[in-house]
Amino acid sequence: MSNFDDLQILDQLQTSARFRGDTRIRRFKGSNNSKSPFGLNPSSRISQWPRITFIRAKDNYNPAEELCQLIDEQNAHNEAKHQSKEIMLPKETNVKSCEDLSKTGEIKALDIVLFKAITSKGDTLKVKKIPEYAEAFDTTKNVEVSSFPEKSMNENVLIQHSLNLAPSDKEISSTEESEQLCYKEQESEKELYSKDNDDSLDILNVPNLVNDDIANNNAAPPPPLAQAQEQLSTENEDEFDIDDTTDKMTTFTMNKFADLSVLEEDDDDEDEDEELEGEKEEEEEEKEKPEISNYDETEGKVNFSLEDSESLEFDEGSDDYDYAKLTTELVGNTDSLAEDEDDILEEDEDEDEEELLAIFDASDDSEIEAYLSIGDTLQNDFTIYDYDSEDEEYNNPSTQKTEKVSQSKKGAKVKEEKGLKKDRKLPKKMRKAQKKLERKAGKAVAARMGDAFSNSLDDESMNLYAELQEQWLKDKSKKARRRAEREKLRSEGLLGKKSKKKLLRESQKPSSSDSDNASLTRIDKIFINDVYQRMQQFKHSAIEEISLPPCRKYVRRLVHALANDLNLKSRSYGSGNKRYTMLSKTHKFDASSVDLVSLTRIMERLQTRVEYQSFSKSGRKSRMTVSSVRSSKATRVYDGQIVGEDAPEISKENPGRRLLEKLGWYAGKGLGHPENEGSKDSLRAIVKVSRSGLG
């Protein structure tokens, strides 16, 4: 058997009709096929192909593997056929042909791989077995149909081929000699080539030479089949004179892989006729079968399907069957549930429970099995259902459907199921009327429930309902008020965090529209008025010191100026934004001088004294200084001055003084033991301005 390289197989696949026009084959390195249909155009490169199908010919299409597979299939088919029909093939002819072929070795066509040819549609054409006497025909002439007998024409196939083979002198060259040879071969090997239409398979076989002249090597062997024509496709069948009486048509074709292959066109008309006849016979058999009528449960009879009746053994000789007898036998074979039912009822009576009034067969569509998702059940698997007998009877539509299907024939199952599905879908008008009734029923039920709920309300629930309604109205009014406020702020652009920060920045900036002071904002004025109100508290209370809330630097300066005019001490503590001012009384403080007139006078004076001084080059923040027309003596400090020298005596209402008096202290007495009494004067703090000395 000759072997083919990958490149040779690629050359054959490229021009074969197996692949479509859009299929391209990528060659291996070393391929020198100059007849490539793709050319050297850059657009035909692999990278430019829209859709590429790469095929490795050795893996995809291997003629050697296919030939081995065909040989194995043929051997298995022959063995099975011989075992079934017990037909012994004549061994002499086979051995003789094999010996002849092995001795001569002149037919070199046997070394070439034979394979199934493939049409342009991708369908494989089956190969027909070639009769042994086919080689005896004249290869240069077409055999007439009338020259063959009728039986040989029906069993065998007319072979037409035109090969450019040079016939030898001893070959048969006339149709008369070929007819005689056909008759001889038909009588000797009639059993070998007779086939049934059902068991016929298309097989591949190498023709055996029966001609004595060729077998004895007396004549010159024919030239090798490789010199035959390249290909004869099935499209050229009309060129041959073919009689319509033949059952099958085969033609010899040539391919580049092998020298000879046989294409066969199967005629499936006989198979279709056989299928139709088989269906008709089945229908007639079903009509002849007895139709068993269904019995109602109310009459005490049993229903059973046709499948159950077919499983019974009937006497073939008797035409009429005793159905009553058969049904009684069938029922007698099944287990009775009477004892189980009595036991269950007795247990329920002992436990004083409701009686179970009925036992139903649990089919595949029962409620419990559907709930538990159980599959198929056994034949005698039952489930107990408990329901009130005063209600309507229990009719499960799913079980009714299964009974109908079981009672019907096999062919009518699908029709009944379709009929049930159609019945479920009501007409459009009926569906609308049903929905309308459902809506009315739902409204009526809701109205009855509402009336029952309203009648059951007592005084307490009514009071609770009134309270809840009142609270709901309050919440609603509160939300409406907040909504109005938010709408107002939104219209002014003051809603949100960004708007609030913007408003604060604008309030801190100096406003030219302020008639009182160009540098004081509304918040600053409110703070100063608050300071004035706190200072008036010194009139009516014994408070010596007060602390003011933290404020900005220039506001603290204004507070210090105000305290100086009122003869008060002022001092700031803390750092940063938390720096605040402390005010304390002096002996010069006159409470009567603190009035609205003095405050307005101070505010008018401060209006012209507050100025901003900025240092742009140094990058400092703006600094505000307050300049006064006159300076008070209270603000000046002298060297050697006693701190609090002019301070008034602590009043008797002071809680500290009252505590000391309870302990035995009085004015002019020193602190300490009477025998070792301390200084009678209070401790003093002397101011030192100069830096000389330690004291």
From Swiss-Prot:
Domain of life: Eukaryota
All residue ranges annotated as the R3H domain in the record: 525-587
UniProt-listed Pfam families: G-patch, R3H
Record's compositionally biased regions (Acidic residues): 262-286, 307-317, 337-351
UniProt biased composition (Basic residues): 421-434
Region (Disordered): 168-200, 213-242, 257-317, 332-351, 388-448, 475-517
Compositionally biased residues, Basic and acidic residues: 182-198
UniProt KW Membrane keyword: no
G-patch domain sequence ranges: 652-695
One GO biological process term: rRNA processing
GO molecular function: nucleic acid binding
Cross-referenced PANTHER family: G PATCH DOMAIN CONTAINING PROTEIN 2
Protein name, UniProt field: G-patch and R3H domain-containing protein C30B4.02c
Organism: Schizosaccharomyces pombe (strain 972 / ATCC 24843) (Fission yeast)
